[in-house]
Amino acid sequence: MGKIIGIDLGTTNSCVAVMEGGEPTVIANSEGARTTPSVVSFQANGERLVGQVAKRQAITNPDKTVISIKRHMGTGYKVDIDGKQYSPQEISAMVLQKIKADAESYLGETVTQAVITVPAYFNDSQRQATKDAGKIAGLEVLRIINEPTAASLAYGLDKTDSAHKILVYDLGGGTFDVSILDLGDGVFEVLSTNGDTKLGGDDFDEKIMKYIADEFKASNGIDLMQDKMAVQRLKEASEKAKIELSASQQTNINLPFITADATGPKHIDLTLSRAKFNEITHDLVERSIEPMRKALADAKLSLNDIDKIILVGGSTRIPAVVEAVKNFTGKEPSKGVNPDECVAVGAAIQAGVLTGEVKDVVLLDVTPLTLGIETAGGIATPLIERNTTIPTKKSQVFSTAADNQTSVEINVVQGERQMAMDNKSLGQFTLSGIAPAPRGIPQIEVTFDIDANGIVKVSALDKGTGKEANITITASTNLSDDEVDKAVKEAEKFAEEDKKRKEKVEAVNNADQTIYQIEKTLNEVGDKATEDEKAAVRAKIEDLKKVKDGDDVEATKAAIEAVNQSFYPIATKMYQQAGGAEGAADPNAAAGGAQSAPHDDNVVDADFKVDEDK
């Protein structure tokens, strides 16, 4: 059985980990970083950039750079790139493909299975969309687990011998969750969860952006929010300012040539203090307090019952957030986990539980929202209350609302409101073939079945006729099986195109290095080679220059080989004349490591990486 990776698919950054030798290890990406920006950029030449390289060029390509797509998971939102519509699942799959490739590079083997985390307060549509994203990326998602629960696994794996209750406060880039867990004897039991899927670090950035834009407009009469490139620069500057204010009392925001008018170019040079930042983001911090209060109430606990407070997510580095949690709970938050990595680490531990690598750990998670159906008068009748341990199954008998009714339409809803229309409709299905009878006589048993991923199945049975209908919830905003399959094929096609593009870049890079090194050697060789020998090599170099920028990678490789072969006699002479017996044994070494396959692929790869980092 191959390795199962654990993925924290975040709003702003993602992270991947794997179990090695019984311990979770965070995998660095191809750029050497332990987290990868969840950013996708589409280039004019059809190339797709993902991660840090995509984030770096967002200012110059704002229309074709997609950020924070996680906030739209499970909705009908589409991204339009050059007339092609992309769903949030497809964009997320591009991020997952990058993560998968980095994991495969690290492990040296193909990765096909993963555990992926989601915010605890994600509804069924959002969870299903996340699973679809994994499938499109070529991953079988064995388990969807809640982010705070994953963080608790990372925190508590080495503390399974002591019983204690923890409150996990998870404020990420785009979502907020709070979960209360009971840890003891290797059992991680979620007692309650609450949250806000529209609260995160992005909102803090937006507050700073608005403040800067308002100040600039007041001084210059220009609305920067109408200029896409200026907005992207403001976004980057706001995120940077937020991060700096976590360590400093003030920061300088300097954006030269942000725009221009008839009087000339305009610049931003603004000092933002931590006190001002706290003032403009106070309402966001306050929004996180009520979910903590509700989670405690649902768990039937008081603050005195909580033993530890765990902070998760990059946004918990904001001093005002830490202070608010401390003031509310009366406890100093634990520093026992890395807020950026612990969710991925927890996902890897869960993967280890599934493979049997991690023993004596049991995870009991809950459904975050109440599930029910719409009944007469538009009332939402609950079947499974929020914070019920999953997997679970629950049945309830209903009847018809009219005489001689032969079918019923069942509207499945998720949420805490009294009326069905105020909750999220997960899907509808019809039970037909009910025997005609006065209203209230037929007995229709509705059964809800929630699996360990939090994915819902609903069935209805007419107990009189034995007729049955069922639905696996796939809301209209999710992709159909055909759409997922199509997206999988497109993702595979892009992966193949990316591979070819990389081969071409490597071949061109190899050619340039070969040309440079051998031309340099020819200029230094003096009378150790005849003019005819030099001319023969230069002719092959000219042939290489003609083909290297074309699309035929094999022709480029052949031309490189021809240059190397033509240089071989000169290299041999050089070493013989120098009396270098060892050198004569490897005349190709005179080319300074510029050779291509089949001589020395490793050297070429190293050159390629250095150029890429520049």
From Swiss-Prot:
Compositionally skewed regions (Basic and acidic residues) per UniProt = 598-614
Q: Which domain of life does this protein belong to?
A: Bacteria
Q: Which residues carry this modification: Phosphothreonine?
A: T175
Q: Which UniProt keywords apply?
A: ATP-binding, Chaperone, Nucleotide-binding, Phosphoprotein, Stress response
> Matching CDD domains, A to Z?
ASKHA_NBD_HSP70_DnaK-like
Which InterPro entries did the record assign?
ATPase_NBD, Chaperone_DnaK, Heat_shock_70_CS, HSP70_C_sf, HSP70_peptide-bd_sf, Hsp_70_fam
**UniProt cross-references to Pfam families, sorted A to Z:** HSP70
Say yes or no: keyword Coiled coil present. Answer: no
* Region described as Disordered: 577-614
Q: What residue spans carry the Low complexity bias annotation?
A: 583-597
What would be an example GO MF term here?
ATP binding
Q: Briefly describe its induction.
A: By stress conditions e.g. heat shock.
Q: Which NCBIfam families match?
A: PRK00290.1 (NF001413), prok_dnaK (TIGR02350)
- Family the entry assigns: Belongs to the heat shock protein 70 family.
Q: What does this protein do?
A: Acts as a chaperone.
What is the recorded name of this protein?
Answer: Chaperone protein DnaK
| Species, as recorded | Clostridium beijerinckii (strain ATCC 51743 / NCIMB 8052) (Clostridium acetobutylicum)
